[in-house]
A protein has these predicted regions:
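Short, flexible helix-loop junctions that flank or precede catalytic/ligand sites
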Residues: 1-174
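A short, hydrophobic C-terminal helix/tail in secreted or cell-surface proteins
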Residues: 175-179
């Protein structure tokens, strides 16, 4: 996304990583530079891509979704428990359904799960195939699942875990969802 010909405008609180070739804006509510104020300013600068650190209030949501409707690619974050809850959260903030369905193309929810320690992982034979079937796996696939667990070692401080792994849920919108 970082091509010189693209006008990318991010509003962040705080700016966590410096992006080469991108003019980042640090939100400062104490001087009136809110996410909503930054978005209003961005729309006068002919951006191709707008990054909004967080949709915290109705005004920011409305401006962000309207920017998406006028041809801008808008990325943002919103605190919810899962991807489908994003729609409910936007509705609870007072956003009309037509605006949500017209402007939202993709919702990504992220969870960070603990990763088994590579240095002490061992097979876990305690996985019940019935539990896997209840989760939607076919009996054939469930019987072939090989699970692992960390037994604990000095490298993971005897926890069996070291690091985190992203798990993502994607919610695509469609014409059927619009109806």
């Amino acid at each position: 996304l970082t091509k010189p010909q693209l006008n990318i405008l991010p509003a962040e609180d705080p700016v966590e990583y410096e992006l080469e070739g991108v003019g980042q804006v640090q939100i400062k509510d104490d001087i009136g530079l809110s996410f909503a104020a930054a978005l209003r300013s961005f729309l006068r600068q002919d951006p191709e891509i707008i990054l909004v650190g967080e949709m915290r209030d109705k005004e920011t949501v409305d401006i962000g979704l309207k920017a998406a409707l006028t041809g801008h690619l808008v990325f943002s974050t919103l605190h919810t428990n899962d991807a489908p809850s994003t729609i409910t959260r936007l509705q609870n903030m007072g956003t009309p359904d037509y605006l949500i369905s017209a402007a939202c193309q993709l919702v990504v929810a992220q969870r960070l799960a603990r990763r088994n320690c590579k240095d002490c992982k061992v097979p876990d034979d305690d996985v019940n195939p019935k539990v896997l079937q209840d989760l939607g796996f076919t009996a054939e696939v469930a019987s072939r699942v090989k699970a692992i667990k960390g037994k604990g070692c000095p490298k993971c401080k005897d926890t069996g875990y070291k690091g985190r792994q992203g798990i993502y849920c994607l919610l695509y919108t469609s014409d059927a969802a619009d109806e």
